[in-house]
Amino acid sequence: MAKAFVFSLCLLLVFNGCLAARQSQLSPQNQCQLNQLQAREPDNRIQAEAGQIETWNFNQEDFQCAGVAASRITIQRNGLHLPSYSNAPQLIYIVQGRGVLGAVFSGCPETFEESQQSSQQGRQQEQEQERQQQQQGEQGRQQGQQEQQQERQGRQQGRQQQEEGRQQEQQQGQQGRPQQQQQFRQFDRHQKTRRIREGDVVAIPAGVAYWSYNDGDQELVAVNLFHVSSDHNQLDQNPRKFYLAGNPENEFNQQGQSQPRQQGEQGRPGQHQQPFGRPRQQEQQGSGNNVFSGFNTQLLAQALNVNEETARNLQGQNDNRNQIIRVRGNLDFVQPPRGRQEREHEERQQEQLQQERQQQGGQLMANGLEETFCSLRLKENIGNPERADIFSPRAGRISTLNSHNLPILRFLRLSAERGFFYRNGIYSPHWNVNAHSVVYVIRGNARVQVVNENGDAILDQEVQQGQLFIVPQNHGVIQQAGNQGFEYFAFKTEENAFINTLAGRTSFLRALPDEVLANAYQISREQARQLKYNRQETIALSSSQQRRAVV
Amino acid sequence: MAKAFVFSLCLLLVFNGCLAARQSQLSPQNQCQLNQLQAREPDNRIQAEAGQIETWNFNQEDFQCAGVAASRITIQRNGLHLPSYSNAPQLIYIVQGRGVLGAVFSGCPETFEESQQSSQQGRQQEQEQERQQQQQGEQGRQQGQQEQQQERQGRQQGRQQQEEGRQQEQQQGQQGRPQQQQQFRQFDRHQKTRRIREGDVVAIPAGVAYWSYNDGDQELVAVNLFHVSSDHNQLDQNPRKFYLAGNPENEFNQQGQSQPRQQGEQGRPGQHQQPFGRPRQQEQQGSGNNVFSGFNTQLLAQALNVNEETARNLQGQNDNRNQIIRVRGNLDFVQPPRGRQEREHEERQQEQLQQERQQQGGQLMANGLEETFCSLRLKENIGNPERADIFSPRAGRISTLNSHNLPILRFLRLSAERGFFYRNGIYSPHWNVNAHSVVYVIRGNARVQVVNENGDAILDQEVQQGQLFIVPQNHGVIQQAGNQGFEYFAFKTEENAFINTLAGRTSFLRALPDEVLANAYQISREQARQLKYNRQETIALSSSQQRRAVV
Amino acid sequence: MAKAFVFSLCLLLVFNGCLAARQSQLSPQNQCQLNQLQAREPDNRIQAEAGQIETWNFNQEDFQCAGVAASRITIQRNGLHLPSYSNAPQLIYIVQGRGVLGAVFSGCPETFEESQQSSQQGRQQEQEQERQQQQQGEQGRQQGQQEQQQERQGRQQGRQQQEEGRQQEQQQGQQGRPQQQQQFRQFDRHQKTRRIREGDVVAIPAGVAYWSYNDGDQELVAVNLFHVSSDHNQLDQNPRKFYLAGNPENEFNQQGQSQPRQQGEQGRPGQHQQPFGRPRQQEQQGSGNNVFSGFNTQLLAQALNVNEETARNLQGQNDNRNQIIRVRGNLDFVQPPRGRQEREHEERQQEQLQQERQQQGGQLMANGLEETFCSLRLKENIGNPERADIFSPRAGRISTLNSHNLPILRFLRLSAERGFFYRNGIYSPHWNVNAHSVVYVIRGNARVQVVNENGDAILDQEVQQGQLFIVPQNHGVIQQAGNQGFEYFAFKTEENAFINTLAGRTSFLRALPDEVLANAYQISREQARQLKYNRQETIALSSSQQRRAVV
């Protein structure tokens, strides 16, 4: 019996020690044991005051192999997703709803009044503000109350002016605005915010903080892809979210891979599903989980030149709302008018950017922070059917997003694709030449098969709405939409990902001489010709067997 | 005895568990345990119907450290190496023979008639073909037989015209060709093929499929280097070959590192040497090993719009010819005229490419697939002695290939070198500054010494024809040709690999002040001067001890 | 008891086998277990004849995670640090002293006479030298003695001329210099050397050899950072130093990670501190440790065309001075005049370089070795207070070095920063957006806190002069200078590293709308306004709590 004990202890040690070692080796650099892929729903959920964050377990072999992590964020009406940044560049696809997103670039100017109001007013405002700040500096805190009052009035007036429209503002002459008005202008000034809506793709570089707010009338749902194996991430392959406010739970704290919290929290081995609204032990400890929390409160207060009470608020102590909070009343800040104007504004910005970039010889970030990030376009809508790059009336349509239509993607080395296949429509069998593809099923269903280098189907599944699956680089894949059609969004881990089709007018087969086909496949030349010319569609293939002459 | 059992079981577990763990850590990112290098012949062989594929075990520490894999492919006369692609960019050196290579870029036009015949004819042809295809679409399959007959006649005629030469074609006026001729033109149309011959280097990007065919009168032998640790490979460090036809064996299935075949094949632990013509168990299982094999036959047939029988042929079921097959009769397809014209054609293409690239600011792939890959030059011959970049009449010559003479190498981040040293000629001791060097011995023999950072010779060997060895980055190396001379080809894992010599006119020693040498090596100033000036050759050093005044 | 034996053997095996496995997994690609950081002094020291080399243990988790290694080199007066190169690009910061550094680029011309004397003289000299070399070739060795004598005289004369100054030289007409003088000019010719002094940063690419010499009147102290996880290093993550002279000890031979020496040296497990002046076992073995040592002596002699005795001297046999040697007398070589002229010279070079680079479209190394490395500027002084990029009269100043002011850093993908904070001055809390920061404390002390993604302080320490600590990418950090002020140098692992501040005029907080702050931190709008506007300084924050109006 003692021997048995020795033996099992031995076993235990071996499996504790070595298997742990093996587990952490599944990084893409080491080994991709892709014997079996699976389309999966998220397997971890964090409940917050005004929404929830669901994550896919990034320790799964397919995620490890592709070097990605993914999450789905649901923000309720009037919910604010607290500012955070990540160690990996990410693409966000807005599955549903409307809202506002603010990305913060330290050192960039707080442009949000100027860009929406007449520049003349903006200039006056700035001078005024400059003056006010000096007064504030000289007169100290006592003036605070009064200023705030002024500002509230100014804000109301400012909003009225906005609604009167831009035309009127431009009509106002240089000196047309009475001096008095300026005293009641709104005071708030901040960096650019961006409207987001269903179909938008937002690109966020590693280390860049962003927040978002649902000001629509339904839930705002977004799917995020983190490219953890990107060159921009110099830490390890674990996705890490750094929150700058609140007392958030770790979204990716799965399977004990991430560091255990320092205080007041036991490791939760094997517990993937977080209990919602669990008693937060941090509260008793008086320690939050955001970046401010780790600083000495006194030192932080000194650095910010505020009192320690405010510093403690930054540190998120006694905050149990988690990372998505409910805003008291409506969130009230300077916002751009929606729609056409915004689009024109962005187009102008983009033109300017491209001119700059041509002068720079295509070198992004070459001229420092100010000339690039501050004016960088971060989003593009690919939900509009008119925007389709590939369209087959009887099969479906595909829209692609790459560095040509969203230049920041060149820097991030990511691209994306959104597709809608009609019932039984077939996505031509193909392989991804230079990227992994991470596919999220927006709506509908499809039969998907993925094939490895040995000719084995490592994925053969009916994928459903809300699931996500990975098609590794170079692996063959075929997809056929189900009865409900198939609507998906695909993240690709290269700036201009492209595919090589195995059927259709641009397929591999078409590129080969007839006799090579005939010999390779042991078929007649007639059959070879059929292989080459029986399909006139390119990527979106209709399912009917009849020949068509559509070119 | 029971104790002994426990003990050995323990040991077993430890070595099974932990050593396996250690083994898979030898990726370049982790550790290079380069205590001993060795020049080796391939240690795995796959016999196919019309040739063989030999591979070097990529799990060896030196290969793992350098992040490369290598194979040698022998194609018999009239043999066709089936189309395949790899997860790693590769360089192919043609050691012997002649043939044709076709690289497939999905979406690129099928240009092979136009580029070899007059453009006027090509245009007419295209229109005709367009018309024929529409007819085909309208009239369906019945016409197939007839078309094929027409086409055969057209092909014969086409070949006659080719032999009449290009000049005559150009003399023919716009309308000079009778309408009747066009009906008998050859029909086949496919992507560019490239003639290959001894001394050619061909660059194939990751994920790009290619096939090759031996139409010469001797065996076609090629050595392939796969740069698996390239950024272009987002999978793991294992080389993977994806075949698009046939029922191939896994060329790199060594030491159980690759995934075992899903069906019908047991793991073959430790069995490096494949039995030739082994009974293929796939045949009984009815499952092939190419990419098509993994798709559902019915779905594949639907996608291709062919019958299921043809789809099954694509899947390579019941095919036991392996990856190199014997062509029935001669492989008959549109081919470019050989020699001077081809060269001129390519040069024109290259000029155009360079102009484009200058306009683009040197950004390859920046403008999408069509403008780059489709017109990209993939090969360059470095076998011609006249082409030598370094030549020493009494020692030997070296030709280099980098992104300047083959621009795609900038994109692939690879370069190459071919050298021929006369008997006793010395390759100056040197180190590779920015690349690993993987050297294949084409002919002859040499004494090679490689030195690590501790001053230890980790390779000291008489290398022979057919062997391959790795000189890791920064390691010192010296080579002296043997009695038969020394002819080699070196793959380098950086686009413009360069070396730093330790002897010769451009050596490290020459760059140092006399007194630094005198003090560092505890020698007199006179000796220091000798170190600097006793060798007037640069890299290829003659072995005689006499001083020479050649500068 | 036997059982106990089995058990402990088991344990032993498990811990030997598996823990070793775990240890080597701490590469950045795998896992960053950064639960605890620490500012540390070097923990390994090698004593040499004229100085010492101290290294930080690169196997520590923080170094492994950041992919860096570091050393501090102290060269005594008249000491020569023998030529070496490394597998990683490095930045060298000169903490103290003056000296000369020579970087060797194989194949670049030996330009050092021309650039320091009048070009007219230089031209004559070159012609003369050419002639002399030919004579040497023709007349062989007998002339050696005589030449050397001439040269010594020439050298003395040359130095006098230098001291007479450059103006005079330029006044001398084309033919003004008597023929006789030219016969007595100094003979030595070598590649460019560069003067180094306190405050200089020198960038050395991977695989590029350099040597340095202390010709000042105090110790020359330098701190080196090696970016081992750089793309330029294709070997593993271990820093490797390849010496080209002497019989050096392995500076980074810690914890048995590096390969044990082949001969005559036992593994020294756990022995971090090297005994100074230990009996060198190599002497008995007759084998050195530099790159030449590993070559066959006869073959080396043949390659260099020198006798075997000289070859043996190159191999460093019987040399026990280690890597820093004392020069006999003064090291006597061609040197540039110091100061203003040098600066002007470099500025001219830089202008030229930038013009070239604009023409090249910003593509470094695109045109081969000759046009880039040979004329590349390698150093820049950031010690001068006037050079500050950020300055706050009551807090301190910061100078940054990136690819804009030292273009080679774009190629190396490194940047740097030097800062001086006055007593109690605060470096604004911030995070590194795109780089790790490796900080060396030059003088003074500071309180430093580093915070991870869970809000835990993983570093909270009073850092002292001579210590080094790592601030990982994206981790929050705050620093407050102690009573003695705080002077530091920070290496950053990205070409244009930038930070995002959490306090100050450009902070994250300032970019957010008031109401977002109010809701996120559960504070009033007034408090939110204070958070945004209470600090007018940007990065260097003064510690006093009073409000200031300085903008």
From Swiss-Prot, chains A, B, C:
S-S pairs: 32-65, 108-374
Subunit structure: Hexamer of two trimers; each subunit is composed of an acidic and a basic chain derived from a single precursor and linked by a disulfide bond.
Region (IgE-binding): 118-132, 145-159, 161-175, 225-239, 281-295, 510-524
Biased amino acid composition, Basic and acidic residues: 339-350
Role this protein plays: Seed storage protein.
Pfam family, one: Cupin_1
Name of the molecule in the record: Prunin 1 Pru du 6.0101
GO cellular component, one term: extraorganismal space
Bias kind Low complexity: ranges: 114-124, 132-148, 168-185, 254-275, 351-361
Tissue: Expressed in seed (at protein level).
A single GO BP: protein hexamerization
Family designation: Belongs to the 11S seed storage protein (globulins) family.
Renumbered residue ranges of the record's region Disordered: 111-194, 238-293, 311-361
Transmembrane residue ranges: none
InterPro entries the record matches: 11S_seedstore_CS, 11S_seedstore_pln, Cupin_1, RmlC-like_jellyroll, RmlC_Cupin_sf, Seed_Storage-Functional
Composition skew (Polar residues), residue ranges: 282-293, 311-323
GO MF annotations in UniProt: nutrient reservoir activity
Segments forming domain Cupin type-1: 37-312, 380-529
UniProt entry keywords in alphabetical sequence: Allergen, Disulfide bond, Seed storage protein, Signal, Storage protein
